[in-house]
Every structure is written in C-alpha cells, then in structure tokens.
Amino acid sequence: EFVVSSDKKLLPYGMMNFADIRLDGYYYVDKTMYIPLIERSNRYFFFIRPRRLAKADAEYAVTLYDVRTKDKFDALFGGLYIGKYPTRDRNSYLVLYLNFSGIIGELHNYRAGLDAHCQTCFDYFCDIYAEYLPQGIKEQLDAKNGAVEQLDYLYHECERAGQDIYLFIDEYDHFINAILSDVESLHRYTKETHKEGYLRAFFNKIKSGTYSSIKRCFITGVSPVTMDVVVSRGIL
C-alpha cells in the first residue's frame, strides 16, 4: 500500500512568497543569519544573483522590514536565526517594492512602461500605508507627471510625515538586458544612461531620496551592466 506522509515538508518549487512558504509549512533553508551582515555593510545594498536564484530571499527581506508585519513576526520568523536574534531595524519601515521584470523591454517605449509600473506601485504604497501618510497623498501623487516626479513627491511627503522608506528594486536590469540584445538600441541606451536620459534621472532621484526618507535600498538583478553605468557616474 502506497502512503504519502503528511509529516514531510513540501518543496516550495516556483514559490516566491515568503509568508506562504513559512505559514504553510514548506521546506525553507534558513539564510537569515546574513541579515545583520547586510545591515552593517551598507545602507544601500546592490546584490547580483544568478538567474532564478534567491528570489524568495528578497521577499523575506521585504516582509522582515515592513511595519505592517510586526504582529506576524513570531509566526513568520520564529525558529529562524533572525527570529532568535532580531535586529533593531525589523518592522520599522514603509516598504516600497518595485519589480522591473514586467516593464516592456524596448527603448522607444520603456519610459511609458516604467511610468506605468511605478504608478501602480506608488498607488499601492499609498493605499497600504494610508494610516501612516497624510490624507490626499495618493490624489496629489497621481497628478504628478511620470515616475521621476512621483518618486520625488512621495519621499518628500514621507519625510514630512516622519516615516522612513526601505526601497527594494527587484530585477532592475530586466528590460535593459532586453534592450542590449538589440544592436540598434545600443546607441540610444547610451543616451538614456548618460547626460539627462530618463533612466539616469530616475536613479538620480533615488539618490536624492537617500538624503530624505529613503533610509535603505536593496537593489537586485542578474547583471551589473546597468548599475555599472549609473554607479560609475555617481548616481548611487
């Protein structure tokens, strides 16, 4: 007789939601002992990872720092290293999470894709943190023109409200890698990441935000090429 044991943990194949993995009892390899090292190494952290690897790690970091998950800390992190030795920063930020994997990877229209994605994420941010933010912030934000202006407005309003932002950008290089695969786009790519291109302006605005309410950044992707351009020009 074939019997499936109900005691064995399941492998979280294809799963990236840390809360689901932990609360539903999936197998999880504890790597949270590295969190204190990351916190002490740099407030603005850039992480290059192999493709399709460590996706859930970014997710658990988002969950760890989110002020909204404070009451769930023991359920999510109990038994893990960080649950036994929590850091001072846990559950103390408004988390702004951007994932560039869905942005259209064509240089002639990537700005519209970036604006649309950020608009959705900024609106969601205003909704879930409404109790921490000034009334009417979402309506004022929506009146701004594009991701650069909206980000500028958002981090200034958070500063006025006395709130700190932890900015996560996942797959920051996704649409840029698609652009670089097209030889005809290389010249325009250089234009966008040098001088006053829109992508450069966006990362410049993040840098400006680090003097305001953006207290920490965690940027991850699979290629250093885009970050090499913006870092080498003093953007981050």
Which role does the model predict for each range below?
Residues E1-L236:
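Phosphate-binding site recognition
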